[in-house]
Amino acid sequence: MSERMTPIPFKQLMTWIKEEHDNFGTVFGVNAPYVKKNGKTLPLFKEKLETPFGPAAGPNTQLAQNIVAAYYAGARFFELKTVQKMDGDDLAACINRPCIWTKDEGYNCEWSTELYVPQAFDEYVKAWFAIRIISRLYGLGAEDGFMFNASVGYDLAGIKTPKMDKFIEGIRDASNTPIFRECMEVGCELFPELDGYIRATPSRICDGVTVSTLHGCPPNEIEAIASYLITEKHLNTFVKCNPTILGYEFARSRLDSMGYDYIAFDDRHFREDLQYKDAVPMFHRLKELAEKNGLEFGLKLSNTFPVDVKANELPSEEMYMSGRALYPLTIEMANRFANEFKGALRISYSGGADFFNIKQLFEAGIWPITMATTILKPGGYGRMVQLGNLLDGCEFKPFAGVDYEAVARLSEEAPTNFHYIKPIKEAPDRKMGKGKELPLIDCFRAPCKSGCPFGQDVPEYIELCGKGLFLEALQVITAKNPLPFITGTICAHHCMDKCMRNHYECPVNIRGTKLQAAEGAFEELLAITEMSREGEKVAIIGGGPAGLAAAYHAQKHGLQATVFEKRETLGGIVRNVIPGFRIGDDAIDNDIALIKKTGAEFVMGKEAPDVKELKAMGFDYIVLACGAEKKGRLDIEGNVMNVIDFLYAFKNGGELKLGRNVAVVGGGNTAMDAARAAKRAEGVEKVTLVYRRNRRYMPADLEELELAIEDGVEFMELASPVKQANGKLVCNKMKLGDKDASGRRVPVETGETVEVDADTVIAAVGEKVDLDLLGRYGIAADAYKKGNKKYGDVYVVGDASRGPATVADAIADAKWVIEDITGREIVADIPEEAKPDKEEALLRKMKLQMPGKCEADRCINCNTVCESCVSVCPNRANVAIAVPGKEMRQILHVDYMCNECGNCAHFCPYTDGRPYKDKFTLFANEKDFEDSENNGFMVVCTKCPKVKVRLGGAVKEYILDGKTGLGDLEDLMLTVIKEHGYLLG
């Protein structure tokens, strides 16, 4: 595969647009258009805009199809990708691949156009014509309701070179260029009904330009470039500023305060780049110069921010930051300049602009607004439809100045705004897990289901809840999960970690929706649950979540379950240890009532018989769900209490004399429970959680950590306990070293000590499996292996198998055991109503939406339609193809449109999924085919039809006659040839 893109000829481009739109209702994969209906426009220079936003100079404005896709979705201001004297092969050779990283904030290591300058010019002219044609053809808006803005750099000498001068003259008047004439003639040929309209296409492509300079460019050079463009080329001019103008101390402090302390940069660029004291008088001069020449001058805020590569984000030493981490810097730049000029200086904005701030920016008088990172995430260009509809509700009026007081408020609010703050902990891996390779066909999967240890059918029950079918939803849930109240309240919800909505704003509230279903239909489900006492007998030792789940599944699948619980109550750790402020007894009782209704029997209040006795009693299988009850120890001197003992006493009314100051040692969820409980204990004034690493590396779930902070728990990070005495806990002071195998940085002693007030120390350092107890059931200590669940006809599940784990893990183990005993997979019966409307699912993927009453409105139904790789590709190189006989559209990668930016790989739910390398690929010709290792094909003859195919490294030619043995791949290739011929050129 080559990273070089091949521009699409104008005739093919327009044929593609027309056939795709007419046959499938989409344009370059954008599933719905923005249509301008209210007629409102904004004047800019001598032109007008139907919307004040569009794609920033970058990957989304490099090729004609990118620009057209953005227009179709609602963009009307296009900052074209920067052109400079270095171009084509010379520039492409300097760009390491992949070159885009947008998992959260954005990074890139690519800069100006990878095309040759004349090619770039051609792309912009093709897009100019294409937009005018489709605006009229499909009634999307006025033919003059959009504008292009060229971006040029990086020094005056380069801008004055013949090829750059030709480019600039071309955008001023393209009428005599070959591409302009070609587009006009081809357009008239393809759309004769628009002949006069097409021939009236304006030849002035751009009325304005944005100056982009490299870091370290001297002020006099910047001024010389802008002056030249104003006085010699008579172009309205924006000058792009770097965030380094804020100063190192401010940038470091603001980013650190928002959780971006891991972003590495020194003060080099801050010292070498344009300084604020030099910028202000220069911008005054340039503003006056533009006005003198009857033009406008403004600032483009801001350029991307140079930072160091520290975690192998990209294969380079330095990269450029964008997205939500850039917003707090760029809005402060806007604040300073708006205040300096009292709002009189126009600001073109691009620095983390998205759905959550664009309205405020626009209403503050900051426009045009361009963006890159948000449209490189799932939803892609389609996100702009929502932006257009949002801003349609705003007042459109000529620029009368920036509301600098409003901008000051935006900057002041940015450091505490939820949308821009980095969470305390590193984001969990959003991928589905190891061992799941991206297939060539039928790749759509729901990552949430993969994130659930027992494979809960999440999208299905969410869809049912959205339709008010709570009983059906609860039946889907309990087919695999018999503890809907417990898991609907305290589940660690790793499904939500995987939710694709994380790439939009925040995950679907899957756990809350489960509880909604449980509360909405529990009585109905209980009434129709049948009792059974048939089949082989299963003895279950332990009445916690694992034992309860095993009993339920045994009863539902033809077995007889008897649970032996040594306590008088069921529920295990959830009942006896997890504090009541996290889960009430009613929730636990409901789940137990459901399990009892199945006919499971319970023997309470005494130790379970050993293996011999159980066998003598006629039990065929034994399931050990006895937890991990061997207490963990913190090996230090002093007043130290085990966390389970403490939580048990706290929940069950035991006497606690903790003193005024409590230290909890540990960083997991149990430690958070203990700290929050201690805050509520009588006589306790201060609780400090002590951990040897920092918060970012605590194993606790983010939610539990945040709740502890909300409750007023204090934190002593980088501290390892040594001893407790005289009301103090003495700790070794630690520092973080290199990362270990888990990805967490290893704590290293510094040789210093620190103290914290502590009358009592609660040790939350992990419980262990009681091997002596397992020995009573025939599992010798040397035979026990952590994670192993089967020892002959004795099974070990939950914490007894894994060590301390989650309720969901316990349910997963229980489900697996019953599947192993019965030899049948436990699956849910999915009703037809659980299947969403595919078109609605596609439209949901285009919208950002915070949680609300009905989470079904936010679920994007990845089990039905994924297509993330289609939406995030700036070049439209991943195409969704409807193949006859296949329920869902298949993904075809188009080689000649791809530059290996790698963006699609970040959002493919498969762990190592790289659609640009792993999906079946269409090649334009023999050379491209040979230059790649991708599985894929090239068309040798469309009439035969004959193709050349590579699969697993083997190359072979086929006549597609139904006898190739290629199955679904043959159907895909035939569909491309017969129904998508525009892809072939």
Predicted regions and their residues:
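Glycine/Thr-rich beta-alpha phosphate-binding loop at enzyme active sites
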Residues: 23-38, 247-343, 378-396, 637-638
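A short, basic/flexible loop-to-alpha-helix module at the beginning of a structural domain
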Residues: 39-47, 519-538, 645-659, 849-850
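Glycine-rich phosphate-binding active-site loops on the catalytic face of alpha/beta enzymes
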Residues: 76-86, 243, 360-387
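Ferredoxin-type iron-sulfur electron-transfer modules and their immediate structural context
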Residues: 318, 324, 375, 382, ...
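Rossmann-like dinucleotide/flavin-binding elements
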Residues: 540-562, 603-612, 629-634, 646-702, ...
